[in-house]
A protein has these predicted regions:
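Interfacial transmembrane-helix starts/ends
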Residues: 1, 63, 67-81, 192, ...
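Signature of the first transmembrane helix
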Residues: 1-50, 196-222
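Interfacial segments at transmembrane-helix termini and the short loops linking adjacent helices
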Residues: 31, 94-110, 283-311
């Protein structure tokens, strides 16, 4: 419980810093430039998939006895790959998002830096040093705020470059916090292939969390996309606020005789927090125009729906973390099928922000239902393959 509290505080601090970036950005850049800025930030989330995957693999391997040197060596290889992927993606992103190549490059430069940060977070997570992990999360969020906001005065490109600097500073601090634990040496080797498997899961989550915002600019136009981007902040809050649940319970999900009980706890907590986020968005909706300006009024009444989408994606994330923990990443194929349907729908049907978020939320609900059914069947089969005593042993919630 104490670990959950620590990571919740750290995650909330990091998320608060991220959202504070959006307030001056929406005012100083204007709807059109802010839409460009927000879309590129979402693209960074997609290219941060190797980092997210690496953190889960590092945490899982540390639970099984891996040491820091082994995991950092893996991290350097993944960072190199992320840098190459980011370089290749620059012209594609510039053309697809109707932005300049320099601005796209400034955004995508964050990808390898986030990988280096993820190694240290994974080490702390796997060792259950949640107090230090919470501190690192807060430092990473503060770095993003401190280095990004001044850049807004110069435009989207310099601001986006600030996210890279913030991530590099946080990675250096994270190395000091994590130290050099040797591990037990009993963990099976996990190489790039393991990270690629986890990446398939994290990528589908990133695409789900980003697809509607990435497509809003070409589908709705620059001005409407800027309005939509502000509403998407509510989705981000609902998606990232419960992040601590997955972080704290992931080591238990990776422990066979605790996995099923931990899964039930994760689903219950994410559902409760999601409902709270939807209610909070409905109550706080009038603050949107007060904080961001009257030009964003069209999205005010939709904030609860954005929050519902984010809450559903948080629940989907919890289900797919179970897939990574038990090394059954092929479950992500079911989510990919829903993503393909969502892309087709968003490119053809919506003409307004209301229509786009409605379609995106319904697709998120469909993904939760499909993946939830697959995970339930898998958990029951795994339970049946163990002894009744070990299968029904209650999970300890981070005591």
């Amino acid at each position: 419980v104490r670990g959950l509290a620590w990571v919740t505080v750290g995650s909330m601090a990091a998320n608060l810093c991220s959202y504070l970036v959006h307030l001056p950005a929406s005012r100083w850049l204007g709807p059109a430039a802010y839409g460009e800025f927000a879309s590129l930030l979402q693209l960074v989330l997609v290219l941060a998939v190797p980092a997210l995957a690496l953190q889960t693999v590092v945490a899982r391997q540390v639970v099984r006895g891996a040491g820091a040197a082994q995991m950092r060596a893996l991290g350097y290889r993944i960072a190199l790959g992320a840098g190459v992927l980011a370089a290749v993606a620059v012209p594609i992103a510039a053309a697809g998002l109707h932005t300049r190549a320099g601005t796209a490059a400034a955004a995508l430069a964050a990808a390898p830096a986030l990988v280096l940060l993820a190694v240290e977070q994974g080490l702390l997570q796997g060792e259950r040093r949640f107090g230090r992990l919470a501190a690192l999360l807060g430092i990473a969020g503060a770095g993003k705020l401190v280095f990004t906001v001044p850049g807004l005065l110069l435009g989207p490109g310099p601001a986006l470059l600030g996210t890279t600097v913030g991530a590099l500073v946080a990675a250096a601090v994270g190395r000091a916090l994590a130290g050099d634990p040797a591990g037990t040496g009993t963990a099976p080797d996990a190489g790039v292939r393991a990270v690629l498997g986890a990446s398939s899961v994290q990528l589908v989550l990133a695409v789900f969390a980003s697809l509607d915002l990435l497509l809003s600019r070409p589908v709705l136009g620059a001005a409407a996309a800027g309005t939509y981007a502000l509403g998407a902040v509510a989705a981000k809050v609902a998606f990232w606020l419960p992040q601590a649940v997955g972080v704290v319970f992931y080591p238990q999900l990776a422990t066979p005789d605790r996995a099923r009980g931990a899964l039930r706890t994760v689903v219950g907590l994410l559902t409760a927090l999601g409902l709270a986020c939807v209610a909070g968005a409905a109550v706080c909706a009038p603050l949107a125009t007060m904080l961001a300006g009257e030009e964003y009024r069209p999205v005010q009444g939709l904030l609860w729906l954005f929050a519902a989408q984010g809450a559903l994606l948080a629940l989907l994330q919890g289900l797919l973390l179970y897939a990574i923990a038990i090394e059954r990443t092929r479950m992500a194929l079911f989510a990919w099928a829903v993503v393909a349907v969502e892309a087709a729908i968003l490119l053809t049907l919506p003409h307004t922000p209301a229509e786009m978020i409605t379609a995106a939320a319904l697709c998120a609900l469909a993904a939760v239902m499909v993946v939830g059914a697959v995970v339930t069947v898998s958990a029951r089969r795994a339970s049946g393959s163990r002894s009744p005593r070990s299968a029904t042993r209650p999970a300890s919630a981070g005591h």
